């Protein structure tokens, strides 16, 4: 399976802005910036690339663990 992601960044580190796109369509043209690492435009918490990576790793770990447990005749 091949998946593509596009990340565009314009500007400096603290004042720049980027947009993320994923092939699956789960999100398209999603903005991210230094500010969204801590809050979004409404003052609520935002996301950041590290959080997205951690979410992907946690999801993969959970699925793999479920497969391993099933192979050992355990029902997770």
Could you say what each language-model-derived stretch is?
Residues 1-55, 62-76:
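Extended beta-strand/beta-hairpin segments
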